[in-house]
Amino acid sequence: MADTLRSNFDISDGTTAIELSTVADSTTTYQTILSISLCNTSTSVDHTFDIYIKDVDGGHDGGGANTLYYLYITQSLPALSTFIHNDKIMMQDNEELYMVLDSNSSPVNSVHIITSYLEQT
């Protein structure tokens, strides 16, 4: 089994869901999310956000295909502040990690997101 450290850099795009990480195929067995950092660069606009894992094929108990499992709902992100999630999250084949910004998303590019993870093949 090989382990590779990776990171994604994203900038908010209004209320469109941003895919932070995905385990889409059988070449990657697992991903361990190490940290998610969200920085609100706006000087005056507060935001809230949701972070969830989408179970694409419905392989988990209790949900069907495309069920959303929330880690955060309406989490506060004040102007000029940073939110850091640094608890590990295990993801398997056909799981996707998303972040969605609130409808108060003007300016739309004010939240910068960095996701660090360990890819295990």
Model-derived features: where do they sit?
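Beta-strand-rich interaction surfaces with strong enrichment in secreted/lumenal proteins
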Residues: 7-8, 22, 72-76, 86-88
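Solvent-exposed, conformationally flexible loop/turn segments
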Residues: 13-18, 76-82
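Beta-sandwich interaction modules
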Residues: 80-94
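Residue-level detector of short, conserved catalytic/binding motifs and their immediate flanks
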Residues: 34, 49, 95
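Short edge beta-strand/loop segments characteristic of extracellular beta-sandwich folds
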Residues: 35-39
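Short, surface-exposed beta-strand/strand-loop-strand elements in extracellular ectodomains
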Residues: 43-71
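Ser/Thr- (and often Asn-) enriched beta-sheet segments in non-cytosolic proteins
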Residues: 19, 48-50, 74-76
